[in-house]
């Protein structure tokens, strides 16, 4: 029996039609995760960014139990005879966490290494883009835009014209995953992490989807930087453009996930496999004053999609679940005991979870949130927030002063160690290439 774990970076649940969004941003979920699949309506991340949430997913522990990633993981818990493969290209995860334990094959696309071919391609590509951006007004004035774009596509494939160098594209991620699967005999555990919905957003000219206008790389970069540094200066029109770019990335990623699934089908590794699809965290678009994921544990960052194909699946499940529950579920599927230290439970067992999530502001103040019983509690330094999620699902009216006893109950239920942990952890001892990628991802603003 094979197990497939597909995760998407920065994918918020409410930007999927399956969770009520007006756009069908990920049709692969409807086509490949419909019959015999359970949709979890209330799945939540245990951290607000990758460096917290992915370790929690892989180890079923909180980042406050640092260094959790060096302990048992999903991969190390699985029995002998199961080939374990992991793929990701998240520079932040690689720089901060390194390689999780237990994977027979772990592919991070050599993140941060000196790669002459890739570096040369990227440098030439950036120079070409800058030149095209500089001469664009002249090109358009003389009606030469079509010829310029033809020349651009001749030099660089269309899919690369606005490609980020901060991570590998979904296309290359799928290609590499299928290459690695081809070398496996016997049972397989495959984890594939797609990065494309994470900033920096790109334009895929072969499938633009939701962007009506073609933007230069410089224009996109400037807008993303402004949203990160001066979010209060972003206009309503610019916000909608950022959302269009984000949704287009979801659609592009959907296409590549479909190709992964079709490839697994062709290799007879899909029909009878157990599958989990989820995200490491969501994304902000100014709901609480910030863009991207500034580590503030409101639901736009914590509420993630989750679809599961396997034993006992079907219909939907509304009780709260957490990413901590992924590893115990996979252990259960493979009939192995959970390692000591796993804090989650199998997804199809038990009552609604008490979700605890950690994060931090960019000034590194520890932030901890608790979400259960229809309420959300957030503690940032000495400041407390409390939200009635039934009456105030958008978390706008802080009830901590009006409900001090309830706030105190939340406070007492959250482990003290999580309230004192520095959860920012932006790596500083990195190569120039890694630092450049971290900057492109927005972590150094």
What name fits each language-model region?
Residues 1-445:
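Catalytic domains that recognize anionic headgroups
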């Amino acid at each position: 029996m094979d197990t497939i774990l597909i995760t998407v970076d920065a994918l918020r649940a409410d930007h999927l039609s399956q969770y009520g969004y007006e756009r069908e941003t990920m049709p692969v979920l409807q086509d490949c995760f419909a019959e015999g699949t359970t949709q979890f309506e209330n799945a939540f991340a245990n951290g607000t960014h990758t460096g917290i949430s992915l370790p929690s997913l892989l180890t079923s522990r909180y980042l406050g139990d640092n260094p959790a990633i060096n302990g048992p993981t999903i991969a190390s818990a699985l029995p002998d005879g199961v080939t374990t493969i992991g793929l990701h290209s998240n520079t932040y995860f690689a720089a901060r966490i390194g390689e999780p334990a237990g994977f027979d094959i772990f592919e991070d696309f050599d993140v941060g290494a000196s790669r002459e071919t890739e570096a040369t391609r990227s440098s030439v590509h950036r120079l070409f883009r800058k030149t095209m951006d500089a001469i664009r007004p002249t090109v358009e004035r003389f009606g030469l835009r079509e010829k310029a774009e033809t020349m651009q596509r001749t030099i660089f494939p269309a899919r690369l014209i606005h490609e980020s160098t901060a991570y590998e594209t979904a296309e290359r991620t799928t290609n590499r995953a299928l290459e690695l699967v081809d070398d496996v005999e016997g049972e397989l555990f495959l984890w594939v992490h797609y990065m494309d919905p994470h900033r920096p957003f790109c334009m895929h000219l072969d499938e633009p989807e939701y962007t009506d206008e073609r933007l230069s790389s410089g224009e996109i970069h400037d807008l993303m930087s402004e949203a990160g540094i001066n979010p209060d200066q972003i206009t309503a029109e610019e916000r909608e453009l950022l959302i269009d770019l984000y949704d287009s990335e979801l659609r592009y990623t959907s296409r590549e996930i479909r190709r992964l699934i079709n490839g697994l089908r062709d290799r007879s590794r899909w029909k009878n496999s157990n599958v989990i699809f989820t995200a490491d965290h969501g994304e902000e678009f100014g709901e609480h004053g910030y863009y991207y994921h500034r580590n503030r544990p409101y639901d736009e960052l914590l509420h993630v999609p989750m679809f599961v194909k396997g034993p006992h699946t079907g219909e939907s499940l509304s009780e709260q679940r957490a990413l901590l529950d992924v590893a115990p579920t996979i252990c259960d599927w493979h009939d192995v005991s959970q390692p000591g230290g796993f804090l989650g439970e199998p997804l199809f067992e038990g009552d609604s979870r008490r979700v605890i999530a950690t994060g931090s502001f960019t000034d590194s103040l520890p932030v901890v949130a608790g979400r259960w019983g229809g309420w959300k509690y957030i503690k940032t330094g000495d400041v407390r927030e409390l939200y009635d999620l039934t009456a105030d699902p958008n978390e706008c009216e802080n009830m901590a002063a009006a409900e001090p006893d309830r706030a105190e109950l939340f406070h007492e239920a959250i482990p003290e160690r999580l309230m004192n942990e520095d959860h920012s952890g932006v790596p500083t001892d990195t190569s120039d290439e890694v630092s450049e990628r971290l900057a492109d991802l927005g972590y150094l603003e």
